[in-house]
Amino acid sequence: VLTFCNYFRHVNSGGTYVVEDLHCSYLPRWGGGIDRGDTSMEFLKLLADVVNQPYWQREREPLALLAPFFPGGARPDLTSFRDIVSVTFYDSMCVVEKRAQGAVDGLGERVVVGTEASVSTDPLAHRSTRQS
C-alpha cells in the first residue's frame, strides 16, 4: 500500500502500475485472509471506488475511505489518485491505469434528454439544451 502511494505519482500519464502476487492477501501465513480488511487486495478494491468518486464524494471524504490503511493519522497525498482511470483485476494481479494527459475526467460531458423523470427528477437538472 505504501509502495503504491509512493510510486504511482511517478507513473507517466497514460501509463500503468502493476501489482502482482495478490494471492498473498488471502494466505494467513503472509498476513492475509479473506476477512481481513487491511490487505493489499482490499486497498486496491477501494481504488475502484476512487475511480467512481464523483458519484459518492458528497457523502464521504476520500481520506475517510482510505483511513484504515493509514494508522496513526498518516495521510497519503491523494493528488495522483485523481488520475486513476481504471483498476483491473486478474488472477493474483491488479493493473491500475493512469489517465492520459489531456484526457477528459470520467465519462465526459453528461447529456440528459427528455422531459419526464418518473423515478427521480434529479437527472432533469442535467438536461442538455444543445440540439443533436
Task: Write out the residue ranges for each language-model feature.
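C-terminal substrate-binding/active-site "lid" region of AdoMet-derived donor-dependent transferases
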Residues: V1-S132
